[in-house]
Amino acid sequence: MAFGISESCYRYQAKLSSENAEIADWLVKLTEDETDWGFGLCYDYLRNVEGFQWNHKRVYRIYCELALNLRIRPRRRLKRHKPEPLKEPIKPNQVWSVDFMHDQLSHGRKIRLFNIIDDFKREGLVIDAGYSFPAIRVIRSLNQLIEWRGKPSVIRCDNGPEFISHEFTHWAKQYGIRIEYIQPGKPQQNAYIERHNKTIRYSWLSKNLFDTLEEVQEHATTWLWFYNHKRPHKANGGKPPLAVA
């Protein structure tokens, strides 16, 4: 007795094969472009940014077949007490978190990055690159941001000299902005910006050698757009900050 396979079954198999190739192409491209991304970010990007509805298990199977799961070696995590979770804002401009990062150019000159995020949806607002950031420079960056976005109710920061200076506290008082200082030695109290800093470090800052401050600023501005519009974020259910209603 002979058994035949219908034409529709052949078409279905061909479609599966074609889709699998497309999935593989996307995964290879994403992991080449974003070398710090694991499967979770890749899948969230494909589903929430590109709009593909591919099954999670199917995409992961192809991810493993390509040996992409062997790229990133898991870091050994230290056991530590869970910090008290920060209160989630319910609207934009309720709380901004600010902080500095340090790095250096190819010839050794030290630079700083002044980072600002809106805690609501973790939107990246500013990455300002400079050689030094006295209080007056910090105020200038904030004023430029407030001009187009409006002022926050609260700014959360550490006890760095720029933030406890008379100039900064006087400026905040004039605007009616409350400064929420974290306790010394407890960066987890500013966890949102600390996590943002880590993402900046691993996504591009530690991967590139820059010759000039202008190169750093250009790269930072380009990446910030990508972060807000394209990069999935766990806090937003795997969606980029500006893709969340």
Residue ranges and their predicted role:
Residues M1-A245:
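Charged DNA-binding/catalytic regions of mobile-element recombinases
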